UniProtKB/Swiss-Prot annotation:
Cysteine disulfide partners in this protein: none
One GO cellular component term: membrane
Recorded topology in the membrane: Single-pass membrane protein
Keywords: Membrane, Transmembrane, Transmembrane helix
Chief location of this protein within or outside the cell: membrane
Subcellular location: Membrane
Transmembrane segments: 39-56
Pfam families: FecR (PF04773)
Coiled-coil portions: none
Name of this protein: Uncharacterized protein TP_0484
Amino acid sequence: MTDRRRSMSCVHFFPLKSRGFLPTLTSKKRSVKLSKQDATVTVVILLLILLLGWGYSRALRLSQGKGNPIGRVFFYKKTATRKKNNQALWLKLKDGVPVYHRDVLRTTTGSEAVIVFTDNSRLDIAENTMVRISHTGMKKKDVRLVTGAIRYARAAGNPAAHTVHVGKTTISLSGDGQVNVRGGERDSTVEIARGEALLHDAQGQTLPLQTFTQLATSREDGTVRILHPTFVPLLPDQDALLLTAEHTRSVGFVWLGDATTVQPSVRLQISRYADFSVIETERKLTLPHEANASRTTFKTSERLGEGRWFWRLVPQNGTASAPRSFSVRRARKVMLHTPRAQAVLSYRDAIPPTLFSWTSVEDVEQYRLLLSSRADFSADVKTFSLRTPEISVPGLGEGTYFWKVVPRFDEGIEDPVFASEVGTFSIKQGKELHAPVALFPAEDEVLEHADRENRMVIFTCEPIPEARRYVWTVKNMDANASPLVTTTSVPFLTVPMRSLRARLQEGTYQWQVAWETRRSDRSPYSALRAFTVIEGMHAWEEEPETRDLIALRAPSFVLRDMPALITEKYLLQHRALRCKWTAVHNAQRYTVTLKNKKTDAVLQTATTTGVEFSFTNLAHLEEGSFHWVIQAHTEQEGYEPASAQVVRAFTIRVSELERPRAKEIVHYEYH
């Protein structure tokens, strides 16, 4: 072996972390020279390192796009992947990253995204969807659906041409148009959700499309079939939450119909079930015909209870519309009691605490009282949170005040729909006392009594917080007798609503009232009011004398122990339906009745001396709406034997638990 070969046999290659692959020489000789072959190997290794680095940097550039961004992508659920210019590399995207020209985005199962473009146009992407973006400056903006479902909304006032491609079909949007597209290259469905658009097919034909009026279906061969739906549901919208009034419980339904081809009738179906296996309400509607309008809006209303509902339209000749779900909650507007509207509270002495009271509302967790010196509540607002429908607020000085009450329900809902109107009142101190307002009998009122011997008339006036005594003056205008003057005292720290009960004969009377302070300062009298007392048509002298019985106060339900919606979870936990109410003074027993709200059938009636009852026979219960009915009873002398009935409505739903509200972008219904 020559010296040269001996020296090369000692040449080794091994990696160094900081320098890459470099040759290291170990030799017994002091100096060794490399051949051209060795240098070539070294250069090849260095080129491989540079190539790998360039590929990695290019992949990073692809993940961030290229050029000026045309928008940003955001994710409702999970994330999506993207590739650039038809490259094979799919990269995972982060929320809020830029989107570039010629990007291809892909979502998987459970992934939902939205792209907000720089011109405020929006592209909603459903799961399992692939879409290609092509926005070339301000002149042309294209979106191509490869497969899946999208919703593209064009921003109003944008001069660029917005088009959506699917298969061999092109849709051109104008104005603030919005299009829903579902399908792929072979078969797709197009719906114009808002505005107008033009549809261009493979044969070069152009078809106009209008809002809700036409559905276009493109086939593999490029032909287009235009469908004319007879009816298009509008309201209630999908997963809408409706707040209905206590006295009406009315839900409005709105849909569009083609007035030029409208059918003579349509059936509105409402059910608790999505498959309409049990139809709660079915109403056949005869529709008007308007020949001058291409589309006509139809409206109707139905009384519905609380809970989740589904509705659809069934034409006389045609398929039913897609079912829409909505929820109903019963709402009762808070009514203000005291201080009365436009009341003037005058005080000679120190101003006492002001009493605020209002009507109670079912299922309320908390009331919020807002008190301000400004009508718009923009400044100087005092807020009080409480569980009872009244409160005494001290420390109010002279001036004009505005107040309202907003209830908060068990679910945390606080909405202006439930809030009261804005009340106003004034406080004055050291001024002349103002006259009270006479309420009943009203001016020129005729009181007809069937009992000759007991013509009882009740006089009332508005409450005066500072009043400690009321002075009533009643004069018979048909006789020369002196007017009847009497006083009624107001005990300290009581609600100052006072009445006078007087037995009057037939005739015409005038009356007025004044009030006095604790220092016997008397206010001016109210305006004179005239009324007439007459004998009724059914007055009998032989009618036995009767006396007024004291009415039992009706019980009140303990709402925190009685939910309005009974679910499977509740039944598994309690194994019974529970009813609880407050005790009534002088009541000796209570009757509890469980009734079916729809059929009015009595499921069970029980008598108890307690204030709670449990219905454990759940085997005979079905889903639906029910009523608890409670009535108090007594046998004490001087009391009416039974109080007024109180009713509590509730709904049982076991087979279908509450589901969260679906997001707007992911539910596309096509037929």
